[in-house]
Regions:
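A cross-kingdom feature of multi-pass membrane systems that activates on extracytoplasmic/periplasmic
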Residues: 289-299
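Acidic, S/T/G-rich, low-cysteine, solvent-exposed domains in lumenal/extracellular/periplasmic regions
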Residues: 1-284
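C-terminal signal-anchor/stop-transfer transmembrane helix together with its immediate cytosolic
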Residues: 297-315
């Protein structure tokens, strides 16, 4: 709490507060200083995993249990207009990871298989922040909702699933076997589930009616409403995290958004840079960058379902 207090006491010294994949509960005093930083005009980027699950947990076996992670942030983010849900998203448009398909006792046979818990998220094509970006690689991501009745806030979805996704409530068993024994794709009937929200306008303090003296601020000193401000909330903690690999006994960081299996680089870095530039009010750079058109992934579901139709047409 002391470090956060010192860092945020002078709003001018912190351009953007990035809350990147925290794994411990926030104390109320920490939340108060973050809240007052925002009420004084401070910009913020939240990358939060509301559910605990990761691939490392699967490295020691074929399955693990994903469960809700209590970071004590729900009331704060709810007050600002966002609710992170304790679910996991599956998407037909997803990453492929090597899976051993050999029977027990036989030589390993690694083949690429879709891992539905690692969606290739779609940036919104209608907002300058996310327009013309490549798909973004996420992993064990959750859904997010715009909430509240604050008429002074504008809420925009800037990242979502493909049209072929579904939400699974936790706790739930996560298994690598789903890659080799996939669920019926008719269950993937929830389109464009939001993953990231941009919130703009005047935020209301989560502490405006609370006793704050024991947390270091007199109640009369609590700023109750912010000036025009911005924040981004993402329901994925690892979206801005570089992946690492061990090679010759050395840990090597991969470029942000790079997938070592497909050798592709996805839009994570560009998405992060755009978030920072947008929060920094660098609209000129945003306008220029949004003119760059990049290739998008083909709709693999439609390709598969309509393959025979187009083969017949072209013969």
């Amino acid at each position: 709490a002391y470090g956060i207090m010192i860092m945020l006491q002078n709003t001018d010294s912190v351009d953007i507060l990035i809350v990147a994949d925290p794994n411990e509960k926030f104390e109320e005093r920490d939340k108060l200083f973050i809240d007052q930083y925002i009420m004084n005009g401070g910009k913020s980027l939240w990358c939060i995993d509301p559910v605990y699950a990761n691939l490392d947990s699967l490295s020691n076996g074929f399955s693990t249990i994903a469960f809700e992670r209590d970071l004590n942030l729900r009331d704060l983010l709810f007050r600002y207009g966002a609710r992170l849900n304790a679910d996991l998203l599956q998407d037909v448009v997803c990453m492929q990871y090597p899976v051993n398909t050999a029977p027990a006792g036989q030589a390993t046979n690694w083949v690429p298989a879709p891992f539905y818990y690692s969606p290739l998220a779609t940036p919104s094509p209608t907002h300058i922040l996310s327009r013309n970006l490549n798909n973004v690689m996420v992993e064990f991501t959750s859904s997010i909702e715009a909430v509240g009745e604050n008429s002074e806030l504008r809420k925009s979805v800037i990242l979502s699933t493909s049209p072929y996704a579904r939400s699974i409530q936790t706790p739930v068993e996560v298994s690598l076997l789903s890659a080799t024994n996939p669920p019926d794709q008719r269950f993937f009937n929830q389109p464009n589930i939001p993953i990231a929200l941009l919130l703009e306008g005047k935020f209301q303090s989560a502490f405006q009616n609370r006793m704050t003296e024991q947390m270091g601020i007199q109640r009369s000193e609590v700023v109750k409403s912010s000036p025009d401000n911005k924040m981004i909330v993402i329901a994925d903690g690892g979206i801005i995290k570089n992946k690492a690999r061990v090679r010759n006994g050395q840990v090597q960081l991969q470029p942000l958004g790079y997938d070592q299996y497909s050798k592709q680089t996805f839009g994570n870095r560009d998405f992060l840079v755009n978030c920072i530039d947008y929060l920094s009010d660098d609209s000129g750079i945003m306008q220029l960058r949004s003119r760059v058109v990049k290739l998008r992934l083909l709709d693999k579901v439609k390709i598969r379902d309509q393959k025979i139709k187009w083969q017949l047409i072209n013969t």
